[in-house]
Amino acid sequence: MSSGGLLLLLGLLTLWAELTPVSSLDRPKKPGLCPPRPQKPPCVRECKNDWRCPGEQKCCRYGCIYECRDPIFVK
């Protein structure tokens, strides 16, 4: 395969990997709120949405950090 073809394939794979699956768009968000920001290195992306996290965990965003965290509930 030519280098141009490989570059196109790589670009398409990258775009495909970044797109959110349509099936997650119609799902409601999980209950609860994200806890305070953890102390971690910058720009870690562990998840893209709640449904990529196990159990009741939520996909929480702290700046450029995305990670699965146990929710907190405020009364």
Curated annotation (Swiss-Prot):
Coiled coil: none annotated. It is found in: Secreted. Keywords: Antibiotic, Antimicrobial, Disulfide bond, Secreted, Signal. GO terms for molecular function: serine-type endopeptidase inhibitor activity. Disulfide bonds join C34-C60, C43-C64, C47-C59, C53-C68. Residues 1-24 form the signal peptide. Expressed by the venom gland. Gene3D superfamilies: Elafin-like. GO terms for cellular component: extracellular region; extracellular space. One of its GO terms (biological process) is venom-mediated disruption of cell wall in another organism. Residues 27-72 form the WAP domain. Damages membranes of susceptible bacteria. Has no hemolytic activity. Not toxic to mice. Does not inhibit the proteinases elastase and cathepsin G. Belongs to the venom waprin family. This is Notewaprin-a. It comes from Notechis scutatus scutatus. The lineage of its organism: Eukaryota, Metazoa, Chordata, Craniata, Vertebrata.
